[in-house]
Every structure is written in structure tokens, then in C-alpha cells.
Amino acid sequence: MREIVLTQAGQCGNQIGAKFWEVISDEHAIDSAGTYHGDSRLQLERIDVYYNEACGGRYVPRAVLVDLEPGTLDSVRSGPFGQIFRPDSFIFGQCGAGNNWAKGHYTEGAELMESVMDVVRKEAESCDCLQGFQLTHSLGGGTGSGMGTLLLSKIREEYPDRIINTFSILPSPKVSDTVVEPYNATLSVHQLIENADETFCIDNEALYDICSRTLKLPTPTYGDLNHLVSATMSGVTTCLRFPGQLNADLRKLAVNMVPFPRLHFFMPGFAPLTSRGSQQYRALTVAELTQQMFDARNMMAACDPRHGRYLTAAAIFRGRMPMREVDEQMFNIQNKNSSYFADWLPHNVKTAVCDIPPRGLKMSATFIGNNTAIQELFKRVSEQFTAMFRRKAFLHWYTGEGMDEMEFTEAESNMNDLVSEYQQYQDATAEEEEFEEYAEEEEA
């Protein structure tokens, strides 16, 4: 049917990817060896979106796992679901990118690229009707950002008409693990603007906040953060994998969510937020789900949607629920908060409903917002970038790999343009044009 190939680049991308495969293998009742142990026809009906059926009825993920050092991939391989992947889906170098975007994009990463693309082609050829690619990576490191964006541009070259969406972990305002994060992130965003169709911006700080504030976890681990990300990733593709009353796929999402090609950076949210292993004591109502889903505290990007306006949004509900109630609640929220929605885009919220809830919940909702407040995220990175670039700090690491300073300047101005485009549409209203036309008529 409509297959998706998942590519994972770098340490962060592979850890999130591994968690994601655990989550959806559980949803489709597939054990760590790739054998099906379920009792529902629905679990197998569209399993081919993410899995290839191999001989002996084993299901193998359509995954490409890439890293420039063997460490992370070794731990994925020895992890709980390590045996489910095809051995030749693992492609790794030996020397690492050392948090250097240029190493990932131009030198070390470029050397591995041919063998990575071979695996991507092999996966794409085994598809019946390939819908698109998903990439999980972080923008702060070297491999996920540098090599991840190189992989994107290669895929875009070979498969120009397929949808590419990325789950990109952006540097956080307070939590930083690398000094050169602003450089790597800016150079990556520059690539994402041009080559991705949809980018889900997730950042660790927002995830930490959700874990400590909402889930009351005293010391959140990366495992907890990745659990949140994989819940969102699974929600975004639910409609492809399970039957529903209103379906959405990657392309429908893109068409409904992207009003202008450059503005494809979304903030995801998820409801209800529950910590790993905890059960919900009562089922939430559709109204509570909708409230929680639009709540600023549920956003997985560290920016406040109340500071901007929604150009578009999508809500994907899971579980048995009356359609009428869903429509009413979505209508209510737009009515009550109309100032937060762009009035020149009427009916700008897309809804999808899928009948199968995630494990352990009666119903859940995944939220995707294209909100102009996302500019806060890019502004923050841009300020840090400018502070360092003005002094040319750390630049020798990049120029030493053959990069030119011009590339930095271009990336910086492209990101600043993106910020001002978001600002322009945040200020736009439906009435402006009418006044202009009226004034022209008066003059005539």
C-alpha cells in the first residue's frame, strides 16, 4: 500500500528511531524477532506501511540506520528490538563527526553516502507504492544535522515527487550539550527550508518541561523524552496504519498544513500526557482531550503558541468516539480562541479520526500546529549564531573541512528571512486587502 521508509541519522535520530520501532511494533503486536502475536485483523491489514514481510512470515522494518560511529548502532542492535532490523540496514563509519556539521555534510558523511543511498534504494524498490520518507535526527550534533541534511538532499534528488518529513530535535534554550549547536542548527535549517516538505520541531527543553511539570517525573531520562517523541510520531502516521472515519496521510497533511512552501515547520503536541507504565484511571472526554491538546504546556517545541497565530493546524484523534462530538469541540475551540487563528485562512484546522487507540489508552489525540510563534525558536538560535559568528569563534573547525564563510552568511540570512516571513503572516489580517482595493477605487 502506501509505504514509508524511515531513515535515522546520528545518535539522537537512532535513539528516537529505536524507541519508535518499539512503540509501533507493540501497536501491531510484533515481537522483537519480527513475529506477529496478535489477534486482530486490523493490526495486519496495513502493516506494510512500515514493515516488509520477509520469508517465514517475519516482519522487518523499512528502516535505514545511519551513523558515523559504531557506538549507538551497536547499542540499538543489542537493545530490546535490535534483532528485528535487517543487518544490512545498519550503515556506520568509524571516526564520528565530532559535532561538526561540515564533517557530516561534506567529508566523512559524503564518503558513506553512496552506501546509504544503496540501502535507501533497496528499501524504496521493495515498496509497492512508496508514499515518502521520514527522517529522525537532531540539529545540534554533527551526524544528524550534517549528514542527515545531506541524505535529505540526495533523497530529494532521486525521489522529487515523494513526501519527505523530518522529526528534527532542535537545540534547547537552556539545555545545551554542544557549544557549536547554533552553527550546526542554522546550517541544517537552511537545508530543511529547501528540501523537506514537513518538519516537526521538537526540542528537549519542552520535553523536559512536560516530563517534570505534567508527568511529575523527578529526573527525566532521555528514554522518557524519546517516549514522548515516539508517541507523537506514531500518532502522525496512525491514519495510514489503521482504518479510520477520516483519513490523513503524509501528503494530505502537507497539503492542509503548508500555506506557503517555506513555512513548513510545525509544533507537535500530544494528549493525554501519561508517564510510561502508568495507567489512566478514568477515560478523558473529547472536550478534555481537545482542551489539553491545544494547551501551550503540551507543545513539544519551546515556544508559546499564544504569542503567535495558527496559520493551520491538524488534530488526529484515536479511539472510539462520536464524530459529531469531535467536530463540535474543534469548532468550539476555534470560535472561543478566534484571535489565535489567522482569519484570512478560514477553516484552517484539519481533523482525522482513527478507531484504534494506542496501547493502554481509551482515546488520544496528536496535535500538529503551524504557528507563527515557531519563529521564537529560530530567533533564539539565530541570536546565538550571530554572537559567535561575529567573532568567527570555532569557525576553523568548519573551514578546515573545506567550508566557506559565505555558506554561514547565507544560512544565517535564510533563517532570518524565515523569521520575518512568519512575522509578516502573523500581522496579516483579512481586512487589509479590502482597504487597499477600496482606496484604489477611490483614486480612480
UniProtKB/Swiss-Prot annotation:
CC cofactor: Mg(2+)
Keywords from the named record: Cytoplasm, Cytoskeleton, GTP-binding, Isopeptide bond, Magnesium, Metal-binding, Microtubule, Nucleotide-binding, Phosphoprotein
Assembly mode: Dimer of alpha and beta chains. A typical microtubule is a hollow water-filled tube with an outer diameter of 25 nm and an inner diameter of 15 nM. Alpha-beta heterodimers associate head-to-tail to form protofilaments running lengthwise along the microtubule wall with the beta-tubulin subunit facing the microtubule plus end conferring a structural polarity. Microtubules usually have 13 protofilaments but different protofilament numbers can be found in some organisms and specialized cells.
Residues involved in Mg(2+) binding: E69
Chief location: cytoplasm
Subcellular location: Cytoplasm, Cytoskeleton; Cytoplasm, Cytoskeleton, Spindle
Any one GO molecular function term: structural constituent of cytoskeleton
Pfam families referenced in this protein's UniProt entry, alphabetically: Tubulin (PF00091), Tubulin_C (PF03953)
Family under the similarity heading: Belongs to the tubulin family.
Lineage of source species: Eukaryota, Metazoa, Chordata, Craniata, Vertebrata
5-glutamyl polyglutamate: residues bearing it: E436
Modified residues (Phosphoserine): S172
Name of this protein: Tubulin beta-8 chain
